[in-house]
Amino acid sequence: MAEKIKIGTMWLGGCSGCHLSIADFHEKIIDVMEHADFEFSPVLMDTKYDEIPELDVVIIEGGIVNDENREFAEELREKAKFVISYGTCAVYGGIPGLRNLWDKDEVIEEAYINSITTPNEEGVIPSEDVPHLEGRVKPLGEVIDVDFEVPGCPPRSDVAAEAVMALLTGEEIELPETNLCEVCPREKPPEGLAMDFIKRQFEVGKPEDDLCLIPQGLICMGPATVSICGAECPSIAIPCRGCYGPTARVEDQGAKMISAIASDYKVEEDKTVDPEEVAEQLDDIVGTFYTFTLPAALIPMKIQKEGK
């Protein structure tokens, strides 16, 4: 019998949800275990961080949030022959990346001094026992070389299991490259996706059956999101939030979404609605269009003016 492949997993700046998707491989985990042994996984096994063995493959969840994350990422890159960036936090920075809208010191002050849920009358900032924050959250691939990326918050277990099995058996790994709209069952109106207004989900109530959510006033990130999920959320009338990130052809998910909406206003047809008025209805543009991918955007953080 051929020697089994040695697999490890690690979480960095993530929530462990991606590890739960690995646990949700269900019976497919049996197929994986026929080809591989899990040698290291602080989340799924009772292993210590200082016992990282030599690995054939390591699956890393989470982006680079603090100096400890960076150190582990660099060591895992040295110990593993093949690195998989697993989940949207690892691939794009994820929701923790919205921290990039503030300076590091502002974040620390808000967490330990200003927060009403953290009694700290003496104003003590933990320093010795708490890893130091990086200047900004970064995707894993910005710190170490990554061999393969599996986005998702968390990745679909069936898709992830197929990708891991393909890797273990030497088959070619293929993930979808189309955007979500191309597989969504909802119909796009012939006049385009122009929005006369923007509404929150509770304001719309139950959306019209089978009609695209965008012309109904709901921000759906489908035009700027890769179709790995199979359009599960829009299929049940829940707008896509973009948790799988953009397609391989798109460099900036938020910019792509803004472009997709703006280019469909059909101003040349004397549309009466001013696009700027619609945009003003968005309370949080960055939080809406870059929920999961700000650290990987063309501008990955708030630009600080000199002297501020």
Swiss-Prot record:
It is an enzyme of class 1 (oxidoreductase). Keywords: Oxidoreductase. GO terms for molecular function: iron-sulfur cluster binding; oxidoreductase activity. Gene3D superfamilies: NADH:ubiquinone oxidoreductase-like, 20kDa subunit. The keyword Oxidoreductase applies. SUPFAM superfamilies: HydA/Nqo6-like. Transmembrane segments: none annotated. InterPro entries: Hydrogenase_assoc-protein (IPR051349), NADH_UbQ_OxRdtase-like_20kDa (IPR006137), NiFe_Hase_small_N_sf (IPR037024). Its EC number is 1.12.99.-. It comes from the Archaea. Pfam families: Oxidored_q6 (PF01058). Part of a complex that provides reducing equivalents for heterodisulfide reductase. PANTHER family: COENZYME F420-REDUCING HYDROGENASE, GAMMA SUBUNIT, F420-NON-REDUCING HYDROGENASE VHU SUBUNIT G. The F420-non-reducing hydrogenase is composed of three subunits; MvhA, MvhD and MvhG. It forms a complex with the heterodisulfide reductase (hdr). Belongs to the [NiFe]/[NiFeSe] hydrogenase small subunit family. This is F420-non-reducing hydrogenase subunit G.
